[in-house]
Amino acid sequence: MTRRIQVGAVPVGGGAAVSIQSMCNTPTEDVNATVRQIQRLEQAGCEIVRVAVPTEEAARAIPSIKAAIHIPLVADVHFDYRLALLCVDGGVDKIRINPGNIGSKDRVRAVADACRERNIPIRVGVNGGSLEKDLVQKYGGVTAEALAESALGHVRLLEECGFGDICISVKCSRVPVNMAAYELLHEKVDYPLHLGVTEAGTPEMGVLKSAIGIGGLLCRGIGDTLRVSLTADPVEEVVAAKRILQACGLRQTGPDLIACPTCGRTKYDMLPIAREVERRLKSCDKPITVAVMGCVVNGPGEASAADVGIAGGKGEGLLFAKGTVLRKVPEDQLVDALFEEIDKL
């Protein structure tokens, strides 16, 4: 088990529930726009949010943002250690840096000391795109070994400053390399791991890459917090993260829809019905499993674990619960009958 750190009110590692993170894409110095976006993220289920801090103006916006939100705030700082110190003074809940790119050891120590005094953890965040040139040369490219060695080198700088309140990420856009790097870290250290696939792309491909790269690790017991990085509205990152956690069996924050792929036994137009059920389930927050099946012969049995479901036939279908048929229903009333039953649960 990894050691536990505390990010504001959210525990990370040490057996705590895997938390969901996202990052704002607003200019941090635009406090109103940033707060509005964070409030939307909160409503979607985000539990930790990060903002970029490239300037002093952005750093000085931290207290105002922090005062207007309800989830822990992380400052993402590169190169200028003074920005990290300003964020610490501003009440940020976590700092993301790479100790190796903020200057001398004295500067690293200044950040570590400031964070220690206020019990603020630091995430060492390594990305494949900014990997040290000597490591790229040593390993012949961006490899899992290079990513892990980079992260461990940055961690060592903090440890030499007597700082151990650390979280680590090693993100790469190539899923197999990404996963292998996290596996190496999991073997070598007990710091909590922040999972993600960087530059995953637009939702269509990015969610798929993240589901494999993040979900594959979570199913093996690796990972303590996650961000799904998408070229999209950050709210979509949170929705995808919740779905990944649900698919991995780690969290059920709402209904789980299961539906068969259909075959030659299907006697009704199932796809529009499945889509309608999916649409209406978005307003349901019950942690239930709902099934839409293609035939009355196998449907109820195959979906016997579902709390409630429907299976279509020619002109009519079956409404069932836990594999037991409740009644026959005309095809055009199947969805309404299903939701009447859901309302009873």
Q: What do these predicted ranges mean?
A:
Residues 25, 30-31, 42-65, 96-104, ...:
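Glycine-rich, proline-tolerant flexible connector loops at the mouths of alpha/beta enzymes
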